[in-house]
Protein backbone atom coordinates (compact mmCIF):
# COMPACT_ATOMS: atom_id res chain seq x y z
CA UNK A 1 0.00 0.00 0.00
CA UNK A 2 1.50 3.31 -1.14
CA UNK A 3 0.82 6.74 0.30
CA UNK A 4 -2.58 7.92 -0.87
CA UNK A 5 -3.81 4.42 -1.65
CA UNK A 6 -7.19 3.69 -0.06
CA UNK A 7 -7.24 -0.01 -0.94
CA UNK A 8 -6.41 -1.27 2.55
CA UNK A 9 -8.73 1.23 4.22
CA UNK A 10 -11.69 0.64 1.93
CA UNK A 11 -11.53 -3.15 1.98
CA UNK A 12 -12.08 -2.99 5.74
CA UNK A 13 -14.30 0.08 6.24
CA UNK A 14 -17.38 0.95 4.18
CA UNK A 15 -16.84 4.71 4.19
CA UNK A 16 -18.67 6.74 1.50
CA UNK A 17 -15.63 7.88 -0.46
CA UNK A 18 -14.60 4.27 -1.16
CA UNK A 19 -17.20 4.08 -3.92
CA UNK A 20 -15.49 6.98 -5.69
CA UNK A 21 -11.75 6.28 -5.45
CA UNK A 22 -9.46 3.51 -6.60
CA UNK A 23 -10.10 1.22 -9.54
CA UNK A 24 -12.41 -1.75 -9.97
CA UNK A 25 -10.83 -4.88 -11.38
CA UNK A 26 -13.91 -5.89 -13.40
CA UNK A 27 -14.80 -2.83 -15.48
CA UNK A 28 -11.92 -0.50 -14.68
CA UNK A 29 -14.24 2.10 -13.12
CA UNK A 30 -13.79 3.92 -9.84
CA UNK A 31 -14.60 2.29 -6.53
CA UNK A 32 -13.13 -0.17 -4.03
CA UNK A 33 -15.23 -3.09 -2.85
CA UNK A 34 -15.50 -3.51 0.92
CA UNK A 35 -15.12 -7.05 2.28
CA UNK A 36 -18.22 -6.89 4.47
CA UNK A 37 -21.27 -4.62 4.49
CA UNK A 38 -23.89 -4.15 7.15
CA UNK A 39 -27.33 -5.54 6.34
CA UNK A 40 -29.94 -3.50 4.52
CA UNK A 41 -33.65 -3.52 5.29
CA UNK A 42 -36.64 -2.74 3.09
CA UNK A 43 -39.36 -0.42 4.34
CA UNK A 44 -42.22 0.62 2.03
CA UNK A 45 -40.33 -0.62 -1.03
CA UNK A 46 -37.32 1.45 0.00
CA UNK A 47 -33.92 -0.03 0.81
CA UNK A 48 -32.24 1.45 3.87
CA UNK A 49 -28.51 0.84 4.32
CA UNK A 50 -26.61 0.75 7.62
CA UNK A 51 -29.73 0.63 9.81
CA UNK A 52 -27.94 0.47 13.17
CA UNK A 53 -25.58 3.24 12.14
CA UNK A 54 -28.51 5.35 10.93
CA UNK A 55 -30.11 5.04 14.35
CA UNK A 56 -26.90 6.27 15.98
CA UNK A 57 -26.79 9.24 13.59
CA UNK A 58 -30.30 10.20 14.66
CA UNK A 59 -29.33 9.84 18.32
CA UNK A 60 -26.23 11.95 17.67
CA UNK A 61 -28.38 14.70 16.17
CA UNK A 62 -30.67 14.71 19.20
CA UNK A 63 -27.73 14.85 21.62
CA UNK A 64 -26.08 17.63 19.61
CA UNK A 65 -29.24 19.75 19.74
CA UNK A 66 -29.35 19.24 23.52
CA UNK A 67 -25.71 20.33 23.86
CA UNK A 68 -26.36 23.41 21.71
CA UNK A 69 -29.32 24.38 23.89
CA UNK A 70 -27.24 23.99 27.05
CA UNK A 71 -24.38 26.05 25.65
CA UNK A 72 -26.68 28.81 24.45
CA UNK A 73 -28.33 28.97 27.88
CA UNK A 74 -24.99 30.04 29.43
CA UNK A 75 -25.30 33.62 28.24
CA UNK A 76 -22.04 34.99 29.64
CA UNK A 77 -19.79 31.92 29.49
CA UNK A 78 -16.40 32.39 27.86
CA UNK A 79 -16.23 31.10 24.29
CA UNK A 80 -19.95 30.39 24.06
CA UNK A 81 -20.33 31.52 20.45
CA UNK A 82 -17.15 29.79 19.37
CA UNK A 83 -17.92 26.38 20.86
CA UNK A 84 -21.48 26.54 19.51
CA UNK A 85 -20.03 26.68 16.00
CA UNK A 86 -18.34 23.33 16.63
CA UNK A 87 -21.64 21.68 17.47
CA UNK A 88 -23.43 23.28 14.52
CA UNK A 89 -20.82 21.90 12.12
CA UNK A 90 -20.99 18.49 13.79
CA UNK A 91 -24.78 18.56 13.41
CA UNK A 92 -24.49 19.30 9.68
CA UNK A 93 -21.86 16.58 9.32
CA UNK A 94 -24.14 14.07 11.03
CA UNK A 95 -27.03 14.95 8.70
CA UNK A 96 -24.87 14.52 5.59
CA UNK A 97 -23.45 11.26 6.95
CA UNK A 98 -26.96 9.97 7.57
CA UNK A 99 -27.95 10.79 3.98
CA UNK A 100 -24.92 8.94 2.63
CA UNK A 101 -24.99 5.94 4.96
CA UNK A 102 -28.73 5.36 4.69
CA UNK A 103 -28.58 5.32 0.91
CA UNK A 104 -30.72 8.41 0.33
CA UNK A 105 -28.09 9.23 -2.27
CA UNK A 106 -26.98 5.79 -3.38
CA UNK A 107 -23.49 5.07 -4.75
CA UNK A 108 -23.51 5.55 -8.49
CA UNK A 109 -26.14 8.29 -8.44
CA UNK A 110 -25.35 11.74 -9.82
CA UNK A 111 -25.51 13.62 -6.46
CA UNK A 112 -23.41 11.06 -4.58
CA UNK A 113 -19.95 12.58 -5.34
CA UNK A 114 -21.16 16.01 -4.26
CA UNK A 115 -22.53 14.75 -0.95
CA UNK A 116 -19.31 12.80 -0.32
CA UNK A 117 -17.28 15.93 -1.06
CA UNK A 118 -19.45 17.97 1.33
CA UNK A 119 -18.91 15.32 4.01
CA UNK A 120 -15.13 15.55 3.65
CA UNK A 121 -15.36 19.34 3.67
CA UNK A 122 -17.39 19.36 6.88
CA UNK A 123 -14.90 17.01 8.55
CA UNK A 124 -12.10 19.47 7.77
CA UNK A 125 -14.23 22.43 8.86
CA UNK A 126 -15.01 20.69 12.16
CA UNK A 127 -11.35 20.00 12.91
CA UNK A 128 -10.41 23.58 11.99
CA UNK A 129 -13.17 25.02 14.16
CA UNK A 130 -12.07 22.88 17.08
CA UNK A 131 -8.45 23.96 16.60
CA UNK A 132 -9.32 27.66 16.74
CA UNK A 133 -11.52 27.05 19.78
CA UNK A 134 -8.43 25.70 21.48
CA UNK A 135 -6.87 29.18 21.49
CA UNK A 136 -9.91 30.95 22.95
CA UNK A 137 -8.96 29.87 26.47
CA UNK A 138 -5.59 31.61 26.20
CA UNK A 139 -7.46 34.88 25.59
CA UNK A 140 -5.14 36.03 22.83
CA UNK A 141 -8.14 38.08 21.74
CA UNK A 142 -11.51 38.79 23.32
CA UNK A 143 -13.97 35.96 22.86
CA UNK A 144 -17.38 36.61 21.37
CA UNK A 145 -16.19 39.66 19.44
CA UNK A 146 -16.45 40.14 15.69
CA UNK A 147 -12.77 39.28 15.32
CA UNK A 148 -13.04 36.06 17.28
CA UNK A 149 -16.27 34.80 15.73
CA UNK A 150 -15.50 35.67 12.13
CA UNK A 151 -11.91 34.44 12.33
CA UNK A 152 -13.31 31.07 13.34
CA UNK A 153 -16.05 31.09 10.71
CA UNK A 154 -13.82 32.18 7.83
CA UNK A 155 -11.06 29.70 8.65
CA UNK A 156 -13.58 26.88 8.96
CA UNK A 157 -15.23 27.93 5.70
CA UNK A 158 -11.86 28.08 3.96
CA UNK A 159 -10.98 24.53 4.99
CA UNK A 160 -14.46 23.37 4.01
CA UNK A 161 -13.97 24.80 0.53
CA UNK A 162 -10.43 23.45 0.15
CA UNK A 163 -11.22 19.94 1.36
CA UNK A 164 -14.54 19.78 -0.49
CA UNK A 165 -12.99 21.05 -3.71
CA UNK A 166 -10.06 18.62 -3.56
CA UNK A 167 -12.47 15.76 -2.93
CA UNK A 168 -14.88 16.70 -5.71
CA UNK A 169 -12.11 17.34 -8.24
CA UNK A 170 -10.63 13.96 -7.38
CA UNK A 171 -13.95 12.14 -7.63
CA UNK A 172 -14.71 13.76 -11.00
CA UNK A 173 -11.15 13.50 -12.36
CA UNK A 174 -11.06 17.24 -12.92
CA UNK A 175 -8.15 19.73 -12.83
CA UNK A 176 -5.55 17.02 -13.23
CA UNK A 177 -6.62 15.08 -10.15
CA UNK A 178 -7.44 11.39 -10.49
CA UNK A 179 -9.72 9.13 -8.51
CA UNK A 180 -7.21 6.34 -9.07
CA UNK A 181 -4.57 8.30 -7.15
CA UNK A 182 -6.45 10.23 -4.42
CA UNK A 183 -3.36 11.48 -2.64
CA UNK A 184 -4.89 14.95 -2.24
CA UNK A 185 -7.81 13.54 -0.23
CA UNK A 186 -5.39 11.62 1.96
CA UNK A 187 -3.42 14.78 2.75
CA UNK A 188 -6.31 17.20 3.29
CA UNK A 189 -8.81 14.88 4.95
CA UNK A 190 -6.52 12.70 7.06
CA UNK A 191 -3.06 14.22 7.55
CA UNK A 192 -4.04 17.87 8.01
CA UNK A 193 -7.04 17.05 10.20
CA UNK A 194 -4.94 14.76 12.39
CA UNK A 195 -2.44 17.58 12.91
CA UNK A 196 -5.23 20.00 13.84
CA UNK A 197 -6.68 17.60 16.39
CA UNK A 198 -3.24 16.91 17.87
CA UNK A 199 -2.52 20.64 18.26
CA UNK A 200 -5.93 21.15 19.91
CA UNK A 201 -5.34 18.40 22.47
CA UNK A 202 -1.82 19.61 23.29
CA UNK A 203 -2.97 23.22 23.63
CA UNK A 204 -5.74 22.24 26.05
CA UNK A 205 -3.35 20.19 28.17
CA UNK A 206 -1.03 23.21 28.34
CA UNK A 207 -3.99 25.43 29.25
CA UNK A 208 -5.13 23.19 32.10
CA UNK A 209 -1.68 22.42 33.50
CA UNK A 210 -0.27 25.92 33.10
CA UNK A 211 -3.15 28.17 34.11
CA UNK A 212 -5.83 26.25 36.01
CA UNK A 213 -5.73 24.97 39.55
CA UNK A 214 -8.26 22.23 38.88
CA UNK A 215 -6.94 19.12 37.12
CA UNK A 216 -10.28 17.41 36.54
CA UNK A 217 -10.61 18.79 32.98
CA UNK A 218 -7.65 16.59 32.05
CA UNK A 219 -9.96 13.63 32.57
CA UNK A 220 -12.40 15.02 30.02
CA UNK A 221 -9.57 15.47 27.52
CA UNK A 222 -8.30 11.94 28.16
CA UNK A 223 -11.72 10.36 27.70
CA UNK A 224 -12.31 12.38 24.53
CA UNK A 225 -9.02 11.23 23.01
CA UNK A 226 -9.71 7.66 24.13
CA UNK A 227 -13.15 7.50 22.52
CA UNK A 228 -11.95 9.07 19.28
CA UNK A 229 -8.91 6.81 18.91
CA UNK A 230 -10.90 3.68 19.77
CA UNK A 231 -13.52 4.62 17.18
CA UNK A 232 -10.92 5.09 14.46
CA UNK A 233 -9.17 1.82 15.30
CA UNK A 234 -12.44 -0.12 15.25
CA UNK A 235 -13.44 1.47 11.93
CA UNK A 236 -10.19 1.08 10.02
CA UNK A 237 -8.80 -2.10 11.57
CA UNK A 238 -11.59 -4.31 12.91
CA UNK A 239 -14.65 -3.26 10.89
CA UNK A 240 -14.73 -6.28 8.57
CA UNK A 241 -13.95 -8.67 11.42
CA UNK A 242 -16.86 -7.33 13.48
CA UNK A 243 -19.16 -7.46 10.47
CA UNK A 244 -18.36 -11.11 9.75
CA UNK A 245 -18.70 -12.24 13.36
CA UNK A 246 -22.14 -10.67 13.89
CA UNK A 247 -23.61 -11.91 10.60
CA UNK A 248 -23.56 -8.50 8.92
CA UNK A 249 -25.94 -6.87 11.40
CA UNK A 250 -23.46 -4.11 12.27
CA UNK A 251 -19.96 -3.12 11.25
CA UNK A 252 -17.26 -0.71 12.34
CA UNK A 253 -19.22 2.35 11.22
CA UNK A 254 -21.72 1.74 14.01
CA UNK A 255 -19.06 1.80 16.73
CA UNK A 256 -17.18 4.67 15.08
CA UNK A 257 -20.34 6.80 15.12
CA UNK A 258 -20.87 6.02 18.81
CA UNK A 259 -17.27 6.83 19.70
CA UNK A 260 -17.30 10.05 17.69
CA UNK A 261 -20.45 11.14 19.51
CA UNK A 262 -18.87 10.37 22.87
CA UNK A 263 -15.74 12.30 21.87
CA UNK A 264 -17.84 15.35 20.93
CA UNK A 265 -19.72 15.05 24.22
CA UNK A 266 -16.37 15.08 26.03
CA UNK A 267 -15.50 18.29 24.19
CA UNK A 268 -18.71 19.80 25.57
CA UNK A 269 -18.01 18.42 29.05
CA UNK A 270 -14.47 19.81 28.97
CA UNK A 271 -15.65 23.25 27.86
CA UNK A 272 -18.35 23.26 30.54
CA UNK A 273 -15.84 22.31 33.23
CA UNK A 274 -13.47 25.21 32.52
CA UNK A 275 -16.04 27.95 32.00
CA UNK A 276 -18.64 29.57 34.18
CA UNK A 277 -21.30 32.20 33.89
CA UNK A 278 -20.76 35.61 35.39
CA UNK A 279 -23.71 35.55 37.79
CA UNK A 280 -23.60 39.33 38.13
CA UNK A 281 -24.71 39.81 34.54
CA UNK A 282 -26.70 36.65 33.85
CA UNK A 283 -30.23 35.60 34.63
CA UNK A 284 -30.59 31.96 35.59
CA UNK A 285 -33.53 29.91 34.44
CA UNK A 286 -33.89 27.93 37.64
CA UNK A 287 -32.09 30.25 40.07
CA UNK A 288 -33.58 33.53 41.24
CA UNK A 289 -30.88 35.71 42.77
CA UNK A 290 -32.38 38.76 44.45
CA UNK A 291 -30.30 41.76 45.48
CA UNK A 292 -31.55 44.20 48.11
CA UNK A 293 -30.71 47.68 46.88
CA UNK A 294 -31.94 49.63 49.94
CA UNK A 295 -33.07 48.59 53.38
CA UNK A 296 -36.45 49.76 54.62
CA UNK A 297 -36.51 52.14 57.59
CA UNK A 298 -37.35 50.59 60.92
CA UNK A 299 -40.71 52.32 61.10
CA UNK A 300 -41.70 50.91 57.68
CA UNK A 301 -40.99 47.30 58.57
CA UNK A 302 -44.10 45.23 58.83
CA UNK A 303 -44.61 43.62 62.18
CA UNK A 304 -44.74 39.90 61.81
CA UNK A 305 -44.29 36.89 64.01
CA UNK A 306 -41.54 35.66 61.70
CA UNK A 307 -39.11 38.37 62.81
CA UNK A 308 -38.49 36.68 66.13
CA UNK A 309 -38.73 33.16 64.75
CA UNK A 310 -36.02 30.61 65.24
CA UNK A 311 -36.10 30.07 61.48
CA UNK A 312 -35.04 33.60 60.60
CA UNK A 313 -31.45 32.74 59.56
CA UNK A 314 -32.59 30.68 56.60
CA UNK A 315 -30.55 29.26 53.80
CA UNK A 316 -31.58 32.12 51.53
CA UNK A 317 -29.60 34.56 53.65
CA UNK A 318 -26.40 32.63 53.17
CA UNK A 319 -24.03 33.94 50.59
CA UNK A 320 -24.23 32.01 47.33
CA UNK A 321 -20.96 30.46 46.35
CA UNK A 322 -20.80 29.87 42.62
CA UNK A 323 -18.68 27.12 41.17
CA UNK A 324 -15.01 27.79 40.81
CA UNK A 325 -13.99 30.06 38.00
CA UNK A 326 -11.35 28.62 35.76
CA UNK A 327 -11.10 31.11 32.94
CA UNK A 328 -11.11 33.91 35.52
CA UNK A 329 -7.64 32.80 36.53
CA UNK A 330 -6.39 33.97 33.17
CA UNK A 331 -5.41 37.52 32.47
CA UNK A 332 -6.94 39.59 29.71
UniProtKB/Swiss-Prot annotation:
GO terms for biological process: cell wall organization; chitin biosynthetic process; protein folding; protein transport. Keywords: Cell wall biogenesis/degradation, Endoplasmic reticulum, Membrane, Protein transport, Transmembrane, Transmembrane helix, Transport. Pfam families: Chs7. The chain crosses the membrane at residues 51-71, 86-106, 121-141, 149-169, 182-202, 218-238, 248-268. GO terms for cellular component: endoplasmic reticulum membrane. It is a multi-pass membrane protein. Belongs to the CHS7 family. Interacts with CHS3. Chaperone required for the export of the chitin synthase CHS3 from the endoplasmic reticulum. This is Chitin synthase export chaperone.
Amino acid sequence: MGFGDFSTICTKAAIPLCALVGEQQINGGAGIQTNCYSRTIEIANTLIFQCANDFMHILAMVMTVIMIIHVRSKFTAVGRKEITSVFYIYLLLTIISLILDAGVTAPGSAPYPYFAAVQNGLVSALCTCLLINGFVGFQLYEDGTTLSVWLLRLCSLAMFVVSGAVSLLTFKNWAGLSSKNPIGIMIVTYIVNAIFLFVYVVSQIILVVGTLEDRWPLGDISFGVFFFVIGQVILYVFSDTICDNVQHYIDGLFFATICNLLAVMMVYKYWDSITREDLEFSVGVKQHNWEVKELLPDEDKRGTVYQDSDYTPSLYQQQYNGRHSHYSNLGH
